[in-house]
Amino acid sequence: MKHILRIFRDYWLLFIILVGFTYGVVMANLWLPDKMSEIVNNGIIKQDMSAIWNNGLMMILVTAAGGFCSIVVGFLAARIATGMAQKLRLKLFERIESFSLADFNKFSTASLITRSTNDIQQIQTTSIMLLRLALMAPIMAIGGLQKAMNNAPDLSWIIALAVFVLFVVIATLFTIAVPRFKKLQTLVDKLNLVARENLVGLKVIRAFHNEKIEQKKFQEANVELNKMNLFVNRLMMLLDPIMTLVMNFSSVAIVWFGAHLISSGNLQIGNMMAFLEYAMQVIISFLLLSMVFIMVPRAAVSVRRVGEVLDTLPSITDPKSPKKLPKDAKGKIEFKDVTFTYPDADLPVLSDINFVAEPGQTTAFIGSTGSGKSTLINLIPRFYDVSAGQILLDGVDIRNLKLEDLSGQIGYVPQKGVLFSGTVASNIKYGNAEASDKLVEKAAKIAQAEEFISELKNGYKSEIAQGGSNVSGGQRQRLSIARAIAVEPNVYIFDDSFSALDFKTDAKLRAVLAKETKNKTVLIVGQRINTIMNADKIIVLNEGKIVGQGTHQELMKDCEVYQEIAASQLSEDDLQKISIAAKGVL
């Protein structure tokens, strides 16, 4: 709630104006029945046409003024609520963008999407209702009750009884509905999760012909959400007929008992009519308040869910007193006694990691699945922070660098090429918005992407669909590599980034890349020995520990794990042939 209130402070002036116009609406509504009473008592009964005309004209003017005030209230309420929702949505997005991978793991992607859209929409809708009704209804209820008692105090018990019945009904519905609202948002999360999994994994689903299984999973989530929605909506729908019954019985009771008072000379017809109007205003006010009370718990769930994200402080932030890299920074990476354990995990993924990656050299990492290769290189851009030890960049602990300065030193290429909606050029410029057209073309040429880009209808201005769905996997990887090159970093990180390339393209790319990065630090994660065997240094990982460092030839002599990997992948003849063919490539 504190986040909502902080944003609300920006709209205090509009809120004060809204309060003023709301007061105008209420005063107009409370004034009209009294004038109607005067028309009946002093005009119609006494046959005084001037009283009818004068009071009638005043009623028309007041009605017009009240209508104008109501329009302004609606406009201001929408302006405040939508403005708050916009700022809250931006604040939430900025917080999510600042999360480390460890922070992301606290929430599912589907849940974050729901909180950023559905929950904020719920808050916006409720805010409009609160601003329009929560102020007006109590004032109208109190004012209407006072006016009613002034006109016919002997009938006030009817209003008290009607309000009591409404209170019991609303309290009962409130008690039943509130727990369901939280469940409802959880079910929306679940449905979004199933939908997202199906959209992302559509190819796999079709490949294994599991459409019916996935449809069943979606239908189960859909039916569960539908049942809960139906239950809540049916519960809310009970309020309307109950309200109608209360209003009708109240009207009949007022007319019945009012007629007896009129016949006994204790009440005038105009006063009874005014009392009836005020009674309806009081009852309607309670109906409006009940709508607010029903909406607020659901919005409160959304506020809590959004607050959970906003209250999650990023675990990786800029240091309070950041250090600067030396002016002659070259990109030297050094791991000193690094240990890393994932949050909530019992055992470390990496233990006692020590190595130096020198500028001008290619350092490769290899190991069995789960050995910690990708985790290790994910520590360098600070996707995670080390649990113990240090990672130094040109002698400076990366935790003492501003995140912007650190990222400016790194060209990162993930295993799966990730592209964004936009053009080919905008994707290559993604890491360096100031990159010139010449640099973009150079990066594409080095990444072996120039040929297929030139074949596109609009070349570098060709549109890339969301996720790069209109280009092949190999083309996505080449554009990802070009994006890293365009940053012109001192450190290149390739997380098995050549897996989607054919052998010929791979060889060409590596040959050109070797020239471009001859004075840079290059880190490569490989799954196959033939992709990393010509690196200047190969680091072998096994169960989170370094079990070997050296060249291919040295490791073939001294490292048993490396020998096992080589034996499982290639024959001796293949190793010799690849070694000869690949010389000078890296």
What are these regions (language model features)?
Residues 46-47, 82, 90-114, 118-120, ...:
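Short intracellular "coupling" helices and adjacent cytoplasmic loop segments at the cytosolic face
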Residues 326-586:
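ABC-type nucleotide-binding domain
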Residues 10, 14-27, 129-184, 256-267:
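Transmembrane helices of ABC transporter permease
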Residues 33-37, 74, 89-93, 110, ...:
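Alpha-helical transmembrane segments of polytopic integral membrane proteins
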Residues 1-32, 36, 44-60, 65, ...:
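Membrane-integrated ABC transporters
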